[in-house]
From Swiss-Prot:
GO biological process: translation
PANTHER family for this protein: MITOCHONDRIAL 28S RIBOSOMAL PROTEIN S6, SMALL RIBOSOMAL SUBUNIT PROTEIN BS6M
Organism this protein belongs to: Paracoccus denitrificans (strain Pd 1222)
MF (Gene Ontology): small ribosomal subunit rRNA binding; structural constituent of ribosome
Protein name: Small ribosomal subunit protein bS6
Any one GO CC term of the record: cytosolic small ribosomal subunit
Keyword rRNA-binding annotated: yes
Region Disordered, residue ranges: 92-131
Gene (UniProt): rpsF
Pfam families to which the protein is assigned, alphabetical: Ribosomal_S6
HAMAP family: Ribosomal_bS6
Cystine crosslinks: none
Protein family per UniProt: Belongs to the bacterial ribosomal protein bS6 family.
Keywords assigned by UniProt, alphabetized: Ribonucleoprotein, Ribosomal protein, RNA-binding, rRNA-binding
The UniProt record lists the keyword ATP-binding: no
């Protein structure tokens, strides 16, 4: 079966649990139509490059699937009809990469803290101590 990667953007006013519920919903749609979801990631709330339906932010979800094209078409159709989903992107890939997606790797790099090659950080002065 062909391999696919899907990115879903849901409305910003959903809770995290509701956004993760959408991932489970679309995973079951793929499974019910003869495919399987290999991996899924919830990327969290991110700022959009431009407004979509008057929203500046959205919940991002990432799915890797191994499914026939009919299952993917049905999942996309239901996602486009769903009120909470603003955008869907599906890409066919030759193989799934092991490990976390590039977006998750970038987030992990940002959360590592200070870089060791920069030396020690100076203490910040208060604005009142300018003299």
């Amino acid at each position: 079966m062909p391999l696919y990667e899907h990115v879903l953007i849901a409305r910003q006013d959903l809770s995290n649990a509701q956004a993760e519920g959408l991932i489970e919903h679309f995973s079951t749609v793929i499974a019910d139509n003869g495919g399987k979801v290999v991996d899924n990631e919830y990327w969290g709330v991110r700022t959009l490059a431009y407004k979509i339906n008057k929203n500046r932010k959205g919940h991002y979800a990432y799915l890797r699937s191994d499914a026939p094209s009919a299952a993917v078409q049905e999942m996309e159709r239901l996602a486009r009809l769903h009120d909470d989903v603003m955008r869907v992107l599906t890409v066919r890939v030759d193989e799934h990469k092991d490990g976390p997606s590039v977006q998750m790797q970038k987030r992990d790099e940002r959360e590592r803290g200070d870089r060791g090659d920069r030396g020690e950080r100076r203490e910040r002065r208060d604005r009142d101590d300018r003299n």
